[in-house]
């Protein structure tokens, strides 16, 4: 779409082995700058990334630390609207937002991992992860549309001072021991997680007329406005403390059992307003068991089954009412297989039951009572010949809101993909060639919680060609990628009849990579 991208990746040791605190220290530094014209009516995307990492290890201890910083700006595109209850391909490129509608901010992530081996049987592992996204959103919101005349009512909204963060710390003891003549892989540990979502100034402008989607004139709606005191300073915070015990037991050469128990204590508070008013202050604890069996029917075929329970506090900054935590149960059974020469795959059937599932309509998040997903999944990957490799998947999913007996929004009953890569050399031309391509299938989906319209299914085709050679002393790679090769118009998701996402058109990129 008229853009450019530059990347670098530097990796190497810092000192000789054993010189740094008796161990080996290495670094990696990656960076990227990407800017492009937005593919719809107007707008521009920009991303600047820098990511340093350090790794140190000796005979018994390893330490890994990585950090990533991203400065980004992107159009706040709410997609298209329904015209007489249908999706109109003529509006594929046409936006109803103003040019100032965009989201800009800074994303940061930090990850650390420390592991120490006491013996061949026992080791301890500690991890810490932190992520934060600070951003502002300027939004053109569609509030009503007249399909006959094209008149679109809009408002100028904004969410300023957004600050969403998540941090998680774990500490665990891992052991591989023999007890009662059976091999055990044991894990005992603890976990702490904190999630926080905050929205500062909340601006909700008045709905205004004067814009026609069929003959748009931009610049009639100004950004900004006065913050709504009652809706500003929205905050939701969750603290969760967990203790985990798990054991994988090799009962016989063919039979393996896995059992685990997690106890989680959680605290949640949320509210909004100036002055701040608490809407929810709740706490509780939950036991989450899991159990599984795997049996090797043959060296190439293994049957398995497992059952587990799940728990997740719901965090959102704009809610209709305090959000209760989500509880779930998963039942799964299947077969893992391997075929010659080097093909592996998994066939699984499952049922997932959840209650208090968070759904968002417009910008407002609430929960539905109970949801159930039943399905079949098949994944296959491997080397067909010396030159040809493939990866494919298919899933049948029957997902419903059990209270209303309606399909879940944006969940397709049929999805699948198939991609192949051919790796070869061409006579009289030094280097290697790789050619690949494939397709993704997504079936029809419900477009909103009321099931008032359906998003059509689609097939999207991608392809690439790559050439690897050496120029001078430097390994060099040229790669041409084409996404949505057939330039198919498709709609990946929707939120309402006024917010329907539009898939990107054909995108061609040429990348050159030089290693030194």
What does each model-found stretch correspond to?
Residues 15-25, 59-60, 119-121, 178-186, ...:
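Short loop/turn motifs that connect adjacent beta-strands in outer-membrane beta-barrel proteins
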Residues 51, 55-57, 164, 183-195, ...:
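Structural signature of Gram-negative outer-membrane beta-barrels, strongest in the C-terminal barrel
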Residues 162, 186, 331, 409-516:
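Conserved C-terminal beta-signal and adjacent last beta-strands/turns
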Residues 7, 12, 115-129, 133-139, ...:
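Membrane-embedded beta-barrel scaffold of Gram-negative outer-membrane proteins
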Residues 351-353, 366-448:
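Gram-negative outer-membrane beta-barrel transporters
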Residues 110-133, 156-271:
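Face-selective signature of the C-terminal outer-membrane beta-barrel domain
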Residues 81-94, 145-154, 200-232, 279-281, ...:
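Surface-exposed loop/turn segments flanking beta-strands in extracellular/periplasmic regions
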């Amino acid at each position: 779409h008229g853009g450019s991208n530059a990347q670098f990746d530097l990796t190497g040791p810092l000192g000789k082995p054993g010189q740094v605190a008796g161990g080996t220290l290495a670094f990696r530094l990656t960076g990227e700058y990407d800017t492009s014209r937005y593919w719809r009516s107007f707008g521009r995307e920009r991303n600047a990334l820098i990511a340093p990492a350090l790794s140190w290890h000796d005979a018994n201890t390893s330490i890994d630390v990585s950090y990533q910083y991203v400065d980004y700006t992107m159009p706040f595109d709410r997609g298209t609207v329904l015209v007489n209850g249908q999706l109109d391909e003529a509006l594929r490129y046409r936006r109803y937002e103003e040019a100032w509608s965009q989201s800009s901010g800074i994303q940061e992530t930090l990850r650390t991992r420390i592991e120490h081996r006491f013996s061949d049987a026992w080791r301890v592992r500690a991890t810490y992860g932190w992520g934060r996204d600070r951003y502002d959103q300027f939004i053109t919101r569609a509030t009503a549309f007249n399909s006959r005349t094209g008149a679109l009512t809009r408002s100028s909204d904004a969410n300023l001072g957004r600050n969403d963060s998540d941090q998680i710390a774990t500490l665990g003891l891992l052991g591989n021991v023999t007890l009662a003549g059976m091999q055990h892989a044991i894990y005992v540990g603890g976990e702490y997680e904190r999630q926080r979502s905050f929205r500062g100034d909340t601006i909700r402008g008045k709905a205004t007329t004067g814009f026609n989607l069929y003959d748009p004139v931009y610049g009639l709606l100004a950004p900004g406005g006065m913050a709504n005191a009652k809706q500003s300073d929205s905050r939701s915070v969750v603290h969760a403390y967990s203790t985990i015990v798990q054991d994988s037991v090799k009962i016989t050469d063919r039979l393996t059992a896995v059992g685990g128990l997690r106890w989680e204590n959680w605290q949640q508070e949320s509210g909004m307003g100036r002055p701040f008013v608490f809407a929810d202050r709740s706490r509780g604890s939950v036991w989450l068991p899991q159990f599984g069996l795997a049996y090797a029917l043959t060296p190439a075929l293994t049957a398995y089954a497992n059952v587990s329970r799940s728990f997740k506090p719901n965090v959102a900054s704009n809610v209709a009412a305090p959000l209760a935590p989500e509880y779930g149960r998963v039942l799964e059974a299947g077969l893992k297989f391997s075929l010659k020469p080097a093909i592996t795959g998994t066939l699984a059937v499952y049922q997932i039951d959840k209650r208090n599932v968070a759904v968002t309509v417009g910008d407002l998040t609430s929960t539905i009572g109970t949801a159930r997903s039943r399905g079949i999944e098949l994944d296959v990957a491997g080397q067909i010949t010396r030159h040809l490799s493939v990866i494919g998947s298919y899933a049948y999913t029957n997902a419903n809101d059990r209270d209303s007996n309606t399909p879940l929004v944006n969940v397709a009953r049929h999805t699948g993909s198939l991609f192949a890569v051919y790796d070869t050399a061409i006579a009289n031309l030094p280097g290697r060639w790789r050619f690949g391509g494939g397709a993704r299938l997504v079936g029809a989906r419900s477009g909103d919680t009321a099931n008032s319209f359906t998003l059509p299914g689609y097939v999207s085709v991608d392809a690439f060609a790559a050439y690897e050679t050496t120029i001078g002393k430097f390994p060099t790679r040229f790669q041409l990628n084409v996404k949505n090769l057939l330039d198919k118009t498709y709609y990946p998701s929707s939120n309402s009849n006024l917010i329907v996402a539009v898939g990107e058109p054909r995108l061609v990129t040429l990348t050159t990579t030089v290693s030194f």
